[in-house]
Amino acid sequence: MDQQLTDPTTCLAWLEGHARARRAAGLRRSVRPRPAVDNEIRLDLAGNDYLGLAQHPDVIEAGVAALRVWDAGSTGSRLVSGSTALHAELEAELAAHTGFASGLVFATGYAANLGVITSLVAPGDLVVSDEHNHASIVDACRLSRAEVVVVPHLEVAAVEAALTGRAYRRALVVTDSVFSADGDLAPLAELHTVTRRHGGVLLVDEAHALGVVGARGEGAVAAAGLAGEPDVVATVTLSKSLGSQGGMVLGPVAVRDHLIDTARTFIFDTGLAPAAAGAALGALRLLVADPSLAARSRARAQELARVADAPSPAAAVVSVVLGAPERAVAAAAACREHGVAVACFRPPTVPPGTSRLRLSARADLTDEDVALFATALSAALAEPAGVPGMR
């Protein structure tokens, strides 16, 4: 056998070439630990804490109380030792708030999407998926082994065509409600009409809508009048508006029962940590008690969009498209130098040529925060960064 093929020092040598290619394209990423107290950052617009509840004392205390009662970890699968009374309370109360009959907690929002899609469709079935759907949906579609048709963004007619022109046993139409990069809103009522006409199920990822969309922050599905419909299922994350971690599938009781029996990311994963469940439940109760949080988050998002001359957002996500990845990286770094943390989205997260600053509005932002962002962004876009068109 060729010595080159048996030398253990060369089996991963190809990684270096891939890293060089990503660096040349401006697509290298790095992990930067966030300090408990960051003296350089005066304003965080990078995280997804849309309601400002991650640091709320009641939410923190709810997590601490869960630790004291239920220990540090859930210790096993939800079907073994990983379910607590907190999980059951969270499922019942979040389902009630969003208008669904039942809910099932998963360890992450990613796992919720993987679990529900791979449990609802299989070979012989059809999945119709928006081209801008989250990576967890993309991966779930691949794992399902169903036929997958990716349709142009927000084009209901393309969904209709996909459902009309194929033979299939069952159909699932999948979409984000609020899209994570652009912050735009899917036409849920129209999608539901088309899906129902063809006997399919509509699955909506509400990660960026829960807590922000709707008069009470109940989400886009409920705001569209679709919560509780027998052919509508939703997923949510507990890591954004609820300031914690985890995910949930919401829908008819039959869907919950089916997932308990078949969803591999539920059956074979350790249950959500009690502290995360407790914190999410504490945050949910704050939202229920003060539904104005949703409107305040949306209002601040509109203000940030006006400052940035960005499209009007549907929820809390504000997208400032700059084009080249180098330009977006430089602008994000310049904002940080002025005390403002913003997210930088580059391919493959967004399409080539649309690298951007991605801002997350929060319900607890102040007028002074908005003014600080305006100053930082103006300075960032005025500074040359050695990239054509940076000014």
Language-model features, listed with the residues they occupy:
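Conserved active-site segment immediately N-terminal to the catalytic lysine
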Residues: 199, 206, 210, 218-238, ...
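Active-site phosphate-binding strand-loop segment of PLP-dependent enzymes
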Residues: 149-204
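Conserved N-terminal alpha-helix of the aminotransferase class I/II PLP-enzyme fold
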Residues: 61, 69-108
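Conserved PLP-anchoring active-site segment centered on the Schiff-base-forming lysine
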Residues: 116-135
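PLP-dependent aminotransferase class I/II
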Residues: 235-237, 241-312
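PLP-dependent enzyme catalytic core of the Aspartate aminotransferase-like
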Residues: 53, 57, 61, 65, ...
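N-terminal "arm"/small-domain region of PLP-dependent enzymes with the aminotransferase-like
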Residues: 2, 7-72, 200
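Conserved PLP-binding catalytic core of the aspartate aminotransferase-like
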Residues: 298-339, 349, 353-354, 361-363, ...
